Amino acid sequence: MSQLPTEDQNAPTATLTSHAMLVPWGLFAQHIGLVETLEGVSIPQRRREYTPQTKVIEFLVSILAGCAYLQDISRGPHPLDQDLAVAQAWKQEGWADYSGVSRTLKACTEETVTSVKEALEIVSRPFIEREVMLALLDRGVLVYDGDLTGRPVSSTSTTYPGAAFGWMSDAVQLGYQAALVSLHSPTYGRLWLSVEQHPGDTVSSSQAEALVQAAEARTGARPWRRTDLLAERITQHRALLQEAEVKQASAQARLKETRHRLAQVEQERQMWAQDVAELEVMYRARNRPERPHSRLAQARRRLAVRERRLSRRQKDLERAQRWLERRQQKVADQQAELEQLQQRLDQFIEDNHTNPWPIRAIFRLDGGFGNGPNVALLIEMGYEVYSKATNANLIQDLRRRVLPATPWVRVGKNAEMIAWEGETITNCPYPLDVALERFQTGDKERHGVLLHYGEERVTANQAGWFTFYNGRQTIEAGVKEGKNVFQ
């Protein structure tokens, strides 16, 4: 007779969880060394029931769990601090109440934050290095996407450090701006490299260089700096500075001449004023009437002429002074820019000396970054650039070039383009590929401008250009995902 199955007393006990996805994430975090690395971070707080490091890990897990507020750890519909299965997956004895997590976060110093960031970078570095190598093997190029996105907070709050009012989600709101960089990854599609928090009034145009530097720091790879282009630009800039200095010298000479003419007129006015005063005394002493053609009347007319002339000379002097001030400011600006360019060239020469393995790299940026100085900088740093221009004057200039017979190229379901090669934009001396976009939205026609610098002859494949640039929607999708919580 067969025996009935009996329960194995040593079998593991099943533990229920309301946060199932956090379990494999925790096991993976253990596998890659994240948990162990975070447990080694120094935090200036004594242990009570749980270590400060456990509470920092709990804070990370609460973010992954979608806790919009810290108190959700204990008071949410599925309290995380009661989930032993998740704690065990993250190699912890249990979770603290949210108030304990709050006290630990308050105890963290700048050094603690730096240590946590370093821990995260150490753990993520092998993944980034692998994707960099795969991307270079697969396509021979690294493709970066950069963006600046708003992170609004309560408009009445006074407890968020460094928050400021700025443009976020089509409205002025209180909060922060997050500068993000991602890498196009053969394995994951999108691999986040860096995020930096800034006050809410930060604008995209001020962050282009920082995004590039963050990408290079995370990947450890950079292209060959285009020092030849920059050196030529400096030569041209010196010529512009010399021209500005000549105009400044001319303005100084003009001011000197204007002062001389003013002094001459003032001297004549004083002379005729004295004549009028003497004649008035004489006429009163002799009781003579002042007739229209008398000496006194003629002297008064000559004095009036000098006074009007003096007023004009004073205005001439004011104009000459303003003109000289503008010329002096122009020279000062040119000198400052030349010094900046020379420092950039020196740095880029050093970069090339310490770059035995230059790579090909592309940066895709939205219109907020696409002004002339930023495009020029990225070109000089060695990047191929895909961006948009938001300058209304450029859009209008391109629209005026389009004739009724000019053919538009269909590049999307609701998009057409016309492209030109060898164009320049304000404050960028390098020739660019420029395309005018046309979109039909209802009864309205909208326009945009794409910019490109690089090896690809994008004007011969405008549909490919349009598609590749809009591939940066992966970072925009990531931004939207990051603004929502994981459920």
What is each model feature region?
Residues 2-3, 8, 226-229, 235, ...:
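An anionic, glycine-rich sequence signature occurring as long contiguous blocks
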Residues 15-59, 206:
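Basic, short loop/linker segments at the boundary and entry of helix-turn-helix/winged-helix-like folds
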Residues 28, 58-59, 73, 97, ...:
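Short, conserved catalytic/metal-binding motifs centered on acidic residues
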Residues 69-90:
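DNA-recognition alpha helix
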